[in-house]
């Protein structure tokens, strides 16, 4: 499972995933610290849309600061403002990534990311008689942590083994009607050929809600995963 629940939800809100727009970026040095930057403007509709459903635009920026290049430790800072159906929306986020080479066979990667923003999709799905007047009363907040351990085998066609276990916490309306979803996704991967030429993974996605709600998708469940990837 490549995408986190958080990434998927913020993609629906127009901040991540596939968006139509323009972006410029570059790099500079802050003393001895390398910094990458990017500034973007998108229509926030996502991909495969026939036309833009409103005149609003979403503006965002991202900074990536190289804290410890020897361990590939980077700090990412994200922020965005925009308008959706003439209502102001926002999103902010922070992430840390790192990679440590333990020895000639073992490597460890780690990612942690937290985001918060306006859940304007939820706001616009409610009638004016039951919602508040401010879209920013409807806020989504999430965090995930993903450690990954890799063992290089290089034995015949089997190149490496990977084990990861992602923990996620996501609450799509934490201010007014909190019902956080916690997800645990352990995965075991087998890589064949070089550079992920072929790989298959086995794992489980386990979802837990604070409150289970009948006749909705907000209920505890387990999903077995078998995934095959190949590059040509």
Which functions belong to the PLM regions below?
Residues 1-64, 229:
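Surface-exposed coil loops of outer-membrane beta-barrel proteins
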Residues 23-25, 62-64, 95-97, 111-113, ...:
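Outer-membrane beta-barrel architecture
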Residues 29-35, 68-75, 101-108, 152-161, ...:
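Short loop/turn motifs that connect adjacent beta-strands in outer-membrane beta-barrel proteins
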Residues 35-39, 73-77, 108-112, 145, ...:
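Transmembrane beta-strands of outer-membrane beta-barrel proteins
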Residues 36, 43-137:
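Surface-exposed beta-loop-beta
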Residues 41-45, 79-83, 100, 114-120, ...:
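Transmembrane beta-strands of outer-membrane beta-barrel pores
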Residues 219-232:
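Outer-membrane beta-barrel "beta-signal"
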């Amino acid at each position: 499972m490549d995408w986190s629940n958080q990434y998927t939800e913020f993609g629906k809100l127009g901040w991540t995933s596939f968006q139509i727009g323009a972006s410029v970026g570059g790099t500079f040095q802050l003393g001895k610290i390398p910094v990458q930057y990017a500034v973007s403007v998108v229509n926030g509709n996502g991909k495969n849309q026939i036309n833009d459903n409103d005149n609003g635009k979403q503006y965002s920026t991202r900074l990536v600061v190289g804290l410890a290049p020897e361990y590939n430790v980077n700090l990412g800072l994200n922020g965005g403002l925009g308008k959706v159906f003439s209502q102001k929306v926002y999103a902010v986020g922070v992430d840390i990534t790192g990679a440590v080479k333990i020895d000639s066979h073992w490597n460890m990667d780690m990612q942690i990311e937290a985001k918060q923003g306006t859940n304007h999709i939820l706001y616009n799905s409610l009638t004016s008689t039951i919602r508040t007047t401010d879209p920013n009363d409807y806020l989504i907040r999430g965090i995930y942590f993903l450690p990954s351990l890799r063992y290089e085998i290089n034995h015949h066609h089997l190149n490496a083994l990977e084990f990861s276990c992602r923990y996620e916490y996501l609450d799509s309306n934490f201010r007014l009607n909190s019902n956080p979803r916690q997800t645990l996704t352990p995965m075991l991967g087998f890589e064949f050929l070089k550079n992920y030429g072929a790989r298959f993974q086995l794992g489980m996605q386990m979802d837990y809600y604070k409150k289970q709600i009948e006749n909705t998708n907000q209920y505890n469940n387990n999903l077995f995963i078998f995934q095959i990837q190949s590059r040509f």
